[in-house]
């Protein structure tokens, strides 16, 4: 026993600090989420700047890149169509089977005048009541890592994500797509073409003071998360036209910022940044329940 106790003692570390427990601050989602309507405006203003401020060669390069990107997108959607249709078919079959399991048929005790003529050889002469217990509605909230470490696999990841959004659209399943990034969105800084210049960095520091993302309830225990942004690239709240345009923008952007490459110019704020994964998880604690409430969903 003494030898065991000594061995345990030798395993102790004098450098270990005390365990500290922390709490989470309240999130100001209005300063974190960039809604799909705002993202659309970012792309629109970028296109306006390209048309008015870029050289003819740059404009031609951009136009060609957009055409090639859109063609590639259509080729991908055509290729994925059979997969999406199969997913929808399986989903609907499962729904039908689930509805059948939830169906309960009972006799009412009220005579069925149509079946009464069969009373001599059948006792089944009463009206039946068919009832269905409520099923469960589904919804999907997707969070995409929009960081530099994703550059090698971003295109493949986006392809998988779009298969899910296409499925949701065909199966009428509500969905939201958020990309989490350390790159912040400041409307007044869209004019900058170089986000690494000193003027841009100074402007960001000045704006950081006003764009609070967290409300600290307990200064002694609340952690201090990094500031980040959630870009709502795609949503079931979009109209068919809005979704089509957003899909083209999203596809072109993912190709341009990844190692896959692309000739589509994109806004600075939508470039790949760091990985605020923990912050995105904390934000999901508020986003998912609100998504459930707004859409009347049980399963997310």
Q: Across the structure, where does each feature detected by a protein language model lie?
A:
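Acidic, glycine-rich A-domain
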Residues: 3-300
